[in-house]
C-alpha cells in the first residue's frame, strides 16, 4: 500500500504553474513538519512518556498523511542525493590534493630520514672497523710491553755479554710468540736503550716472515747512551750507516730459522719505533709507509720501563696495515653506492673505497697522498669542497645535502676519530639520485594517478548513490522501523516492570511464612526442656529453614547478577566453620548415596576472613550439589589452601605441594594479577585456592568452558536425567569473578571432575590466624577405623604431619587385630609375630608405637564397622569395652544411627561421639578432650555411668551441628538485609566452661557421678542456660526492654505470636492489633483488646471518614505507647496509610511516637518508601532479634542504647 501511494502521488503531480507553486508549498510544509518530528525523536528518545506521545504522532501521520509524506520523502531524497554528490566531489577533491601533498612531503621526509640513517650506518661501520684495528693494535702493543718489562726485570742489569745475549734471546722468544699469534700484524719492533734493535716483519708480497736485528757487538752491555729524545730517535736508527743490520727468514708457523742471516742496508729497514715517538712516556699513534706495501701502515709505540718504573729501557712498536678498513669500505660501497675515505687531520689519505693508489712515489721513496690530490674524481672534488667550505677549521661532524659536484648533487657527511697524536677524519659521499631519484621522477606521475583515481571514484560514488537510493524512500523505512522499535521497547519495559513486581510480591508471600517458621523455631530453641538430641534436631530444622530463605534471596538477587549490580557484603566470618557446616549438611545426602564427603583444609587457612559469607557458601553449595548429582560412588573432596597475594608471579603458580593451580587465562590473568597487586598493596589480602574433586561421570573437555554459560549443560540429556536449569555454574562463575577470582575445570587423573578456583579475601589485622595446637608432645596414638578410604587417608596424613602416631583399619577384623597387638597384655612384647597377617608398613608403624613411652591411645571407630544388622554389635561393644581403661574411644555416627545404639554407647561410657564426616576440626576437638583428660590426671572411665539418666551425657557429644550456629545459615541473606544474629548458641568446644564440664564428666568415677552432675557451680549453670536458650543474651540484657510499651500491628497470627513472645521475654509490654486501622484506633484506648479479624469490620473508607477527626484530637493529648511495630502489608489500612494518619494527628503537638516498619519485602526501594511516609526505622522478616532490640532502645532509650554500645 505504501509503495502504491508513493507511485500514485508521483503520477498525479500537476503540470501547471499554479500546481507547481502549490506543489512547492506542500513540499515545504511537509518537510518542515518532518524536521519538527525528527528533532524531538533524536533528543528525547530515552523518555518513555515522550516516546509514547511520539508513537501516537507517528501512527497518526502514517495513516492520515501517507501520500504527503511519501511525496516529501521523494523530493527530500532527491535533494539529499544532490547534496551527497556535491559533498562527495568536494571531499574527493580535497582528499586528492591533500593525499598528493602529504604523500610527497612525508615521503620526502621519510626518505631523507632513511638516507641520513644510511649515511650514518656507512660512517659507523668503518669507525667500528677502525676501532677494532686500533683496539687490536693497542692490546698487542700493551701485551708486548708487559712481556718485555717482565723479561727485562728478570735480567735486571746484566753484567756479562752472555747474560745480555740470554736476555735478548728471551725477548726474541716472547716477541715471536706474540707476533705469530697475531696474523694481522705487519711488524713488531723493540728498540733498546743501548741501540740494539729486534724486529719481526711480514712481507705480504712474498708471504715471508723475517727476523731483523742489529749487530750486538757494536753495543755496550749497559745502555750508557742518552735517554732523551735528542739522542735517541728514528733518524739515528735509519741513518746509522756504521751499524750492521741482519735479516733472517723464519718459518711462519714454528719461527725456526730458514738459512743464515743476511746483511741488509739501512734503507731496507721497516719502521722501527724510537723514543721520539713517546716523548711524554705514553702511547702514541702515527702513520707510516713501507716499500713492501702500497697502503699506509698504522703504528703504535709504547715505552718499556725498568724495574724502578722511572727510566725507559726500550720502545715497543706494533705496525698494522689498514687494508681491512679499505676492504670494508669497498664492500659497503658495492651495496649502497657512493664513496668513503679516511684521512689524517692534515688531509692525507689512509683508506678509500676505491682501488686507486694511496701513496705517491718520490725521490725519497713512497709518501702519503692528500685527498685533494686523489686520482678518484669524486673523492678529490669532495675534499676540495670541504676544504673550500670549512678551511682548516673543519667541524668534527659535517652533514651536507644537495652539494653540487660537477653536474650531480651529493650528500656529504664526515666524522672525527681522535687518537693520541693521530686524529682521523672519515668522509662519506653519496649521490642524491641514489636516494631521491625515484621520488623526483615519480612525483608528477603520482599526481596524475591520484587525480585520475579521484575522478573515477567520484563517478562510481555517484552511480552507487543513485542505485542505493532508488526505490522506496529511506525515511519511510526508518519510520516503520522506529515504530517497531518503540513498541518493542514499550513491551520490554512493561515486562521488566512485571518482573520486578513479581519478585517483590513473591518476596512478601514467601518470606512471611518463612519468618513465622523461623520465629517459632527460635521460641522452641529457647525452651530449656529440650534434650541435646532434640535441640540438635530443631537447630537443623532452623538451618534448613534459613537455607530456604536464602534460596528466596537468591531469586531476588538473580536480576542483580544478570545486570552486574550485585553488591557483596564485607563482614568478618569464620571460613572454616562455614565450609564445615556446608559439608555436614551435604554429608547426609552423600551417605545415602554411598558417596564419601571429605573436607581437606590446609593448616595455613586463615581462621577469620572478611567478605560475603553467604555468597561464598552459595558458591560451594552449588559446586558440591552439582558433584553429588553426577557422582554415584566414590568421593567428593573439598580442598582449600591459601597464599599471600604478594607471592603471585607471572603465571600465578603455586608450589607442587599446593597442587599446582593453573595459570588462569594467561594474558588476561597477568593483567588482572598486576592490577590486584597494585590495588591491594597495602591491604591484608589473601588468595584462597579451592578444589572440588569428585569421582562422577566427568565432563567432556570440549565442554569445560561452555558449562559456565547460562542454561548450558555438558550433556543435553542431563536435564532429563538429573534435572536442573544450567544456571548453577553460571552464578558460581559470576560470584567468583565478583570476589576477584576465577574458576575453571582442570584435567585430573582418573574419573570425575576437578573444579579449581581461587578467591581474593581480606583478613582482619588484629586477629591471630591459624594457631595450631602442638600434639606431638603428648604421646598420642590414634587408631582410625573407618570405611571411607579417602577421609581415612587424609586424616591420618594430617595426624602424622603433626607428630601423632597413626594406625589405620578398614574393617572390624583389622581393628581387633591392631587392638590386640597394642593393648593386650604381652602382645606388645611379642614383636607382632608372623602369624598375624600384617603388612610391612603397618608392622613398622606398630613397632614405632611400641617404643613410645606412656602412650595415650585414642581409637576413632566408624559406627559402620559394627554389624548393626544383627545383635552381634552388642558383643562387639563388649569386646571393645575390655580396653576402655587403656584407650579413649570416639565414635563416628551416621545421621540415622538409632537411639538404641546411642543409648548403649552412653551406657558403656563412650561419650565422645562425632557425626560423620570426620575432618580436621572434629579431630582436634577429640584430641583436645583427651589431652585435657590426661592433664588432669583422671584415669578412671565412665563404665557404670550408664545407670544414671541420659541427661548426664547430653553435653558430651562432640558435634558442631549441635553447638555451631555461626554458619552460613545465619549469614547475611541479601545486600539489602541487615546482618542476622550469629551468636544464638556458641560452640561448646570453644567455651572453657563446657570444656571443663566435658572432661569432668568423662573422667568421673561411678561414685562421684551423681555429685558431679548435681553440684554444678553457678557459672556453669548460667552458661548452660544461655547455651540452650534461643536468645544468646547476657543476663543483664535479658530484660533490656523492661518498662517499654510497644504496640504491635501484625495481621499474620503466627508472626504476631512470635513477636509478642519475643518482646515479652525481654520485658516489654506488648499490645497486638490486626491491622493499621486498629493501630490508629488503639492510640485512643490504651487497653484495647486484640481480637482476630472478622467479617463484621467496616470498610476502610467508611470508618476513616467517621473517625479521623476523633483520632487526631485524641493524639494531641497523650501517647499511650512508647513505640509502634508496624507491618506494612495489612488489610483495611496498611502500614503506610496508618503511619500517615498518625503523623497527621501529631501535627501541632510535641508528640512523636517512633514507628518501626516490619515488612517481608527485601527490595531497597521498600526501605526508602517506609522512611518517606514517616517511619523511623526499617526491619525485614524474619526479625533479627538483636537488631530489633538495638533499634527499639535507640528510639526509646537513647542513653541506655549508648551505654550498651560502649559496654
UniProtKB/Swiss-Prot annotation:
Main location group: membrane
PROSITE patterns cross-referenced by the UniProt entry: HIS_KIN (PS50109), RESPONSE_REGULATORY (PS50110)
Entry membrane topology: Multi-pass membrane protein
Entry keyword Transmembrane: yes
Pfam assignment, any one: HisKA
Gene3D superfamilies per the UniProt record, alphabetical: 1.10.287.130, 3.40.50.2300, Histidine kinase-like ATPase, C-terminal domain
Stretches assigned to the Extracellular side: 103-446
Keyword Phosphoprotein: yes
Outcome reported for the amino acid change (mutating residue 1075 to E): Loss of histidine kinase activity and impaired interaction with AHP2
Database matches in InterPro entries: CheY-like_superfamily, HATPase_C_sf, His_kinase_dom, HisK_dim/P_dom, HisK_dim/P_sf, Sensor_HK_Regulatory, Sig_transdc_His_kin-like_C, Sig_transdc_resp-reg_receiver
Histidine kinase domain ranges (all copies): 505-763
Any GO BP annotation: response to water deprivation
Role of this protein: Functions as an osmosensor histidine kinase that detects water stress and transmits the stress signal to a downstream MAPK cascade. This protein undergoes an ATP-dependent autophosphorylation at a conserved histidine residue in the kinase core, and a phosphoryl group is then transferred to a conserved aspartate residue in the receiver domain. Positive regulator of drought and salt stress responses, and abscisic acid (ABA) signaling. Confers drought tolerance, probably by regulating levels of ABA accumulation. Plays a redundant role in regulating plant growth and development.
Protein name according to UniProt: Histidine kinase 1
Organism: Arabidopsis thaliana
Amino acid at each position: 500500500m505504501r509503495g502504491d501511494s508513493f507511485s500514485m502521488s508521483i503520477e498525479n503531480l500537476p503540470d501547471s504553474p499554479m500546481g507547481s507553486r502549490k506543489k512547492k508549498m506542500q513540499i515545504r510544509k511537509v518537510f518542515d513538519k518532518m524536521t519538527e518530528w525528527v528533532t524531538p525523536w533524536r533528543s528525547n528518545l530515552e523518555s518513555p512518556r515522550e516516546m509514547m506521545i511520539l508513537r501516537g504522532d507517528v501512527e497518526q501521520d502514517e495513516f492520515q498523511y501517507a501520500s504527503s509524506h511519501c511525496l516529501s520523502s521523494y523530493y527530500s531524497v532527491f535533494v539529499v542525493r544532490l547534496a551527497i554528490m556535491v559533498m562527495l566531489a568536494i571531499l574527493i577533491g580535497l582528499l586528492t590534493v591533500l593525499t598528493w601533498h602529504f604523500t610527497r612531503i612525508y615521503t620526502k621526509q621519510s626518505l631523507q630520514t632513511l638516507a641520513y640513517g644510511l649515511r650514518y650506518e656507512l660512517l659507523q661501520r668503518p669507525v667500528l672497523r677502525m676501532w677494532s684495528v686500533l683496539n687490536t693494535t693497542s692490546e698487542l702493543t700493551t701485551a708486548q710491553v708487559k712481556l718485555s718489562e717482565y723479561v727485562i726485570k728478570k735480567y735486571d742489569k746484566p753484567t756479562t755479554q752472555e747474560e745480555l745475549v740470554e736476555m735478548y734471546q728471551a725477548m726474541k722468544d716472547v716477541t715471536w710468540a706474540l707476533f705469530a699469534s697475531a696474523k694481522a700484524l705487519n711488524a713488531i719492533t723493540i728498540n733498546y736503550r743501548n741501540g740494539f734493535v729486534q724486529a719481526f716483519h711480514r712481507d705480504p708480497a712474498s708471504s715471508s716472515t723475517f727476523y731483523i736485528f742489529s749487530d750486538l757487538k757494536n753495543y755496550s752491555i749497559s745502555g750508557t747512551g742518552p735517554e732523551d729524545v735528542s739522542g735517541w730517535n728514528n733518524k739515528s736508527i735509519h741513518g746509522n750507516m756504521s751499524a750492521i743490520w741482519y735479516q733472517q727468514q723464519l718459518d711462519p708457523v714454528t719461527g725456526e730459522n730458514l738459512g743464515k742471516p743476511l746483511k741488509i742496508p739501512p734503507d731496507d729497514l721497516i719502521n722501527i719505533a724510537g723514543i721520539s715517538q713517546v716523548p711524554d712516556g705514553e702511547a702514541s699513534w702515527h702513520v707510516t709507509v713501507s716499500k713492501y706495501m702500497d697502503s699506509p701502515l698504522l703504528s703504535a709505540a709504547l715505552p718499556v720501563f725498568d724495574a724502578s718504573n722511572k727510566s725507559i729501557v726500550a720502545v715497543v712498536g706494533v705496525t698494522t696495515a689498514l687494508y681491512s678498513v679499505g676492504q670494508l669500505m669497498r664492500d659497503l660501497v658495492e651495496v649502497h653506492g657512493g664513496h668513503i675515505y679516511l684521512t689524517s687531520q692534515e688531509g692525507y689519505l689512509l683508506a678509500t673505497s676505491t682501488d686507486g693508489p694511496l701513496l705517491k712515489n718520490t725521490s725519497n721513496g713512497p709518501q702519503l697522498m692528500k685527498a685533494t690530490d686523489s686520482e678518484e674524481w669524486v673523492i678529490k672534488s669532495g675534499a676540495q669542497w670541504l676544504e673550500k667550505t670549512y678551511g682548516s677549521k673543519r667541524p668534527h661532524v659535517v652533514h651536507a645535502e644537495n652539494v653540487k659536484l660537477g653536474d650531480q648533487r651529493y650528500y656529504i657527511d664526515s666524522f672525527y676519530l681522535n687518537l693520541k697524536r693521530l686524529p682521523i677524519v672519515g668522509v662519506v659521499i653519496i649521490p642524491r639520485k641514489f636516494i631521491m631519484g625515484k621520488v623526483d621522477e615519480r612525483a608528477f606521475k603520482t599526481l596524475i594517478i591520484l587525480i585520475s583515481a579521484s575522478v573515477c571514484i567520484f563517478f562510481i560514488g555517484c552511480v552507487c548513490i543513485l542505485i542505493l537510493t532508488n526505490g522506496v524512500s529511506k525515511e519511510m523505512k526508518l519510520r516503520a522501523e522506529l515504530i517497531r522499535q518503540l513498541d518493542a521497547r514499550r513491551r520490554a519495559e512493561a515486562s521488566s516492570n512485571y518482573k520486578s513486581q513479581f519478585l517483590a510480591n513473591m518476596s512478601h508471600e514467601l518470606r512471611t511464612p518463612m519468618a513465622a517458621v523461623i520465629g517459632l523455631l527460635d521460641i522452641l530453641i529457647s525452651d530449656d526442656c529440650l534434650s541435646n538430641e532434640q535441640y540438635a534436631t530443631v537447630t537443623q530444622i532452623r538451618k534448613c529453614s534459613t537455607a530456604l530463605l536464602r534460596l528466596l534471596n537468591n531469586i531476588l538477587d538473580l536480576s542483580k547478577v544478570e545486570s552486574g549490580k550485585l553488591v557483596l557484603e564485607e563482614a568478618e566470618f569464620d571460613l572454616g566453620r562455614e565450609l564445615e557446616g556446608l559439608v555436614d549438611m551435604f554429608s547426609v545426602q552423600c551417605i545415602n548415596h554411598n558417596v564419601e564427603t571429605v573436607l581437606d583444609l590446609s593448616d595455613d587457612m586463615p581462621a577469620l576472613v572478611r567478605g560475603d559469607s553467604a555468597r561464598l557458601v552459595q558458591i560451594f553449595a552449588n559446586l558440591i550439589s552439582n558433584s553429588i548429582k553426577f557422582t554415584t560412588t566414590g568421593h567428593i573432596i573439598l580442598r582449600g589452601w591459601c597464599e599471600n597475594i604478594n607471592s603471585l608471579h607471572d603465571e600465578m603458580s603455586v608450589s607442587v605441594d599446593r597442587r599446582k593451580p593453573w595459570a588462569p587465562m594467561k594474558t588476561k590473568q597477568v593483567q588482572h594479577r598486576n592490577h590486584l597487586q597494585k590495588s591491594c598493596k597495602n591491604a591484608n589480602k589473601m588468595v584462597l585456592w579451592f578444589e572440588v574433586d569428585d569421582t562422577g561421570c566427568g565432563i567432556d573437555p570440549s565442554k569445560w568452558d561452555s558449562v559456565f554459560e547460562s542454561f548450558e549443560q555438558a550433556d543435553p540429556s542431563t536435564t532429563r536425567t538429573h534435572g536442573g536449569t544450567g544456571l548453577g555454574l553460571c552464578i558460581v562463575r559470576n560470584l567468583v569473578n565478583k570476589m576477584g577470582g576465577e574458576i575453571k575445570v582442570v584435567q585430573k587423573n582418573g574419573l570425575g571432575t576437578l573444579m579449581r578456583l581461587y578467591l581474593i579475601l581480606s583478613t582482619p589485622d588484629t586477629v591471630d590466624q591459624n594457631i595450631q595446637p602442638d600434639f606431638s608432645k603428648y604421646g598420642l596414638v590414634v587408631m582410625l577405623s573407618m570405611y571411607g578410604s579417602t577421609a581415612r587417608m587424609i586424616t591420618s596424613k594430617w595426624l602424622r604431619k603433626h607428630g601423632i602416631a597413626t594406625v589405620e583399619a578398614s574393617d572390624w577384623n583389622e581393628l581387633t587385630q591392631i587392638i590386640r597387638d597394642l593393648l593386650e597384655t604381652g602382645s606388645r612384647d611379642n614383636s607382632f609375630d608372623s602369624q598375624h597377617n600384617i603388612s610391612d608398613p603397618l608392622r613398622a608403624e606398630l613397632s614405632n608405637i611400641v617404643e613410645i613411652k606412656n602412650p595415650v591411645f585414642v581409637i576413632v571407630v566408624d559406627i559402620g564397622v559394627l554389624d548393626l544388622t544383627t545383635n552381634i554389635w552388642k558383643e562387639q561393644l563388649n569386646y571393645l569395652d575390655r580396653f576402655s581403661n587403656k584407650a579413649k574411644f570416639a565414635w563416628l555416627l551416621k545421621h540415622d544411627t538409632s537411639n538404641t545404639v546411642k543409648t548403649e554407647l552412653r551406657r558403656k561410657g563412650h561419650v565422645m561421639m562425632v557425626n560423620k564426616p570426620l575432618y580436621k576440626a572434629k579431630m582436634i576437638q577429640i584430641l583436645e578432650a583427651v589431652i585435657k583428660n590426661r592433664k588432669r590426671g583422671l584415669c578412671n572411665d565412665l563404665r557404670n555411668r550408664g545407670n544414671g539418666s541420659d541427661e548426664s551425657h547430653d553435653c558430651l557429644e562432640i558435634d558442631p551441628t549441635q553447638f555451631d550456629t555461626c554458619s552460613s545459615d545465619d549469614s547475611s541473606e541479601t545486600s539489602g538485609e541487615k546482618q542476622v544474629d550469629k551468636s544464638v548458641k556458641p560452640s561448646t568446644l570453644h567455651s572453657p566452661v563446657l570444656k571443663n564440664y566435658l572432661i569432668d564428666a568423662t573422667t568421673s568415677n561411678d561414685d562421684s557421678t551423681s555429685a558431679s552432675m548435681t553440684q554444678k557451680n553457678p557459672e556453669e549453670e548460667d552458661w548452660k542456660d544461655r547455651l540452650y536458650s534461643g536468645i544468646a543474651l547476657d543476663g543483664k540484657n535479658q530484660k533490656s526492654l523492661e518498662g517499654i510499651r510497644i504496640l504491635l500491628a501484625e495481621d499474620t497470627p503466627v508472626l504476631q505470636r512470635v513477636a509478642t513472645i519475643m518482646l515479652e521475654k525481654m520485658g516489654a509490654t506488648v499490645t497486638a492489633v490486626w491491622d493499621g486501622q486498629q493501630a490508629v484506633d488503639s492510640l485512643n484506648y490504651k487497653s484495647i483488646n486484640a481480637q482476630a479479624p472478622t467479617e463484621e469490620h467496616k470498610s476502610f473508607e467508611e470508618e476513616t471518614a467517621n473517625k479521623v477527626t476523633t483520632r487526631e484530637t485524641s493524639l494531641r493529648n497523650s501517647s499511650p505507647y512508647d513505640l509502634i511495630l508496624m507491618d506494612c502489608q495489612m488489610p483495611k489500612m496498611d502500614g503506610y496509610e496508618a503511619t500517615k494518619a498518625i503523623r497527621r494527628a501529631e501535627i501541632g503537638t510535641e508528640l512523636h511516637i517512633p514507628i518501626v516498619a516490619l515488612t517481608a519485602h527485601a527490595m531497597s526501594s521498600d526501605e526508602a518508601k517506609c522512611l518517606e511516609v514517616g517511619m523511623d526505622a526499617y526491619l525485614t522478616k524474619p526479625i533479627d532479634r538483636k537488631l530489633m532490640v538495638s533499634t527499639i532502645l535507640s528510639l526509646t532509650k537513647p542513653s541506655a542504647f549508648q551505654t550498651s554500645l560502649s559496654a
